[in-house]
A protein has these predicted regions:
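Solvent-exposed loop/turn segments connecting transmembrane beta-strands
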Residues: 42-49, 73-82, 110-116, 145-153, ...
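Outer-membrane beta-barrel "beta-signal"
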Residues: 121-124, 224-235
């Protein structure tokens, strides 16, 4: 009887310990999702939900193909306002540099009008590690072919910082990033995106990312701000 009670008490203790650990992990996730989400819903011209899925298929150890689809729900997360499909090829030059050539088809709701855009683009990316800090950047040149408008080039430069190899058993890797947009047609910067997010490394079948994004538009010296909650799944 004593042995049975000992085993029962031990099982209960283990279950409670695991439950407490689970609650702590869930609380961490909720903190990163809910608190910034509440803050982001205040004082923005719009709040949006973005969801992207990216599929990569290696051809060899240096070359891979990629397919991406991206859905964006705007108007305070009530209507689908944007969708793109992107297909491309990536080539790793060395441990530091890689290049991409892609074609993107974009559909965007602008008021009552659904617009369509063809967007071929190329980019060069760079990455480096300094201890626990991973630094990466990329420069992308897009050629935007839009309905009933003259085509033009746009440049997008992004810098990202990741820290650590993974915290908690969920292997959470925090990061911050900033992306600037330069419109060659208008010869000026007209958009900025600031990201703060988490990569989740504990899932082996795919790589999920959760992030919060503030997008700032610049038009005629006036600023507009959109708060965005985003999810990206990489397979």
């Amino acid at each position: 009887m004593k042995i049975t009670n000992f085993i029962f008490n031990w099982i209960v203790k283990e279950i409670m310990e695991q439950k407490i650990i689970s609650i702590k992990y869930n609380a961490q996730i909720l903190f990163f999702i809910i608190i910034p989400g509440i803050l982001f819903s205040q004082g923005f011209d719009d709040t949006q939900l973005w969801h992207a899925e990216k599929f990569e298929k290696p051809i060899n150890d240096k070359t891979s193909l990629a397919l991406e689809q991206d859905f964006r729900i705007g108007e305070n997360m009530t209507n689908l306002v944007y969708f793109h499909a992107d297909f491309g090829i990536k080539r790793i030059i060395n441990k530091t540099f890689s290049i991409n050539l892609n074609f993107r088809e974009v559909f965007e709701q602008k008021g009552p009008e659904l617009t369509r855009e063809h967007r071929p683009h190329g980019q060069i990316a760079w990455k480096r590690k300094l201890g626990l800090l991973a630094i990466s950047s990329r420069a992308r040149l897009e050629y935007r072919i839009r309905q009933d408008k003259d085509p033009f080039f746009r440049n997008r430069d992004m810098l990202s910082l990741k820290y650590g190899k993974g915290f908690t058993p969920l292997m959470l890797v925090p990061y911050v990033a900033n992306e600037i947009f330069y419109d060659f047609k208008k010869s000026k910067l007209n958009r900025n995106r600031f990201f703060i997010g988490l990569n989740i490394g504990s899932i082996k079948s795919f790589k999920p990312t959760i992030y919060f994004l503030i997008q700032t538009g610049i038009e005629n010296k006036e600023y507009s701000h959109i708060g965005i909650l985003g999810f990206k799944l990489k397979f």
